[in-house]
Amino acid sequence: CSSDLILLVTTPRDSYIKITGPDGRKGYDKLTHAGNYGVEASMDTLQNLYGIDIDYYVKINFSGCVAVVDALGGITIDSEVEFTCGEDASPIPYHFVKGPNECDGEMAVAFSRERHAFAAGDFQRGRNQTAAIKGILQKATSPAILTKYSAVLDAVSDMFLTNIPTSTISDLVKLQLSDSTAWNIQTYSIEGTTQPPAGQGPAYLEITGLRGASVVYPYADSIN
């Protein structure tokens, strides 16, 4: 915590990497499929990809995200681009400007779900989801929220799953209250290509059962 740094890394869900499957067996597949085998499989997959230790997780769905953002009293999301949500993301066509946007829970989820409005598709959606998480962290670490964090947690405790001990959360809150230095939240997105590397064309995808599926091959230098 001495660096006051939070690094948010976006890994495309369609990344074709070595994942942890049933009984700990490893094989190449899309990252999102690791989730079929539980949170631990997803954590192990990302640990192997980045060569780091991952101790904790937070798992939340769309309804939980709405509840968390609303419990915080809304958040500010800094959008890279201006766009309007389509029906796949939200029944309400929310419009977002480039720069700061004040969002309630429903707007934050719509912002995080949209992908058809962008030429970069899911890559931009991943960056938007990171921007939304950054907005949540900035609001959650503000003095106004920290001084009543117990009430906020109680309001959303059944909306997400985590293995972070309550004592650890309490220690982090006390640390932040004693040192009001704002966290330096940085974001980074893994880049890749949808074009198979040499020797991994349509026939290869047919063999692996991924022909016709959306697959991203991450750039090695982007991961490193």
Tell what function each PLM region has.
Residues 1-224:
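Non-catalytic, solvent-exposed segments at the cell envelope interface
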